[in-house]
Amino acid sequence: SEVMIRTHNLQVQSKNYFICIKDSALVIEVLKTIKLLSDENQWGDFGTVNKLIVQNMCCKRAFLRGAFMVAGSVTNPEKGYHLEIAVLSAKLAEQLKEEMSAFEIDAKIVERKKYQVVYIKEGAQIVDFLNVIGAHMALMEFENVRIVKEVRNSVNRQVNCETANITKIVNTAA
C-alpha cells in the first residue's frame, strides 16, 4: 500500500490524498471493514455511512471530521458566521445532521443546485463543531475574531446608549 497526494491546479491549498492498495484480498478486507461490501460480497448503500461504523463517539467525530475535510468550508468570522458541508445525497445530509446532534449541534439542511448543504450559522455552534472534529487551532482563531467582534459591538452599544442619553438631556434642557 502507498499514499499519494495530488494538488489541484486551480486551488493551491487543495490536496487530495489517495491510498493505493495493490493486494486485491486486502482491498476486499478494507471494503468489508468500512461496510461498503457485505460478508457475502454484496455492495452496500453508498448514500450513507453504515451505522455500525459510527456507533461510538470517537467514530462520529472521525466521520464528521472526514466529511468536513472532503466537502466542508467555514467563512471568515470577520464577515459572518457560516459553516457548511455540501453533499450530493439527501440521506447523507440527514445522517450528518443526526451525527452533529449527538454533540448537541443544531445543523440545518438546504438544497443548493445539485447539493444538499448541511450548515451552521451560530458562532457558538461553529466553535462546538470545530472542537468536535479536533480543529483546535482553527477554533482558537475563530474565537479570537469572535471575541474582538463582541468587544467592538459592546463598546458601540455603550457609545450609542451614552449618545442617546446625552441627546435626551440636551433636548430636555432646551
Question: What are these regions, as identified by a protein language model?
Answer:
Residues 1-2, 6-146:
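DNA-contacting interfaces and partner/effector-binding or oligomerization modules
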Residues 132-174:
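Extended mid-to-C-terminal alpha-helical interaction segments
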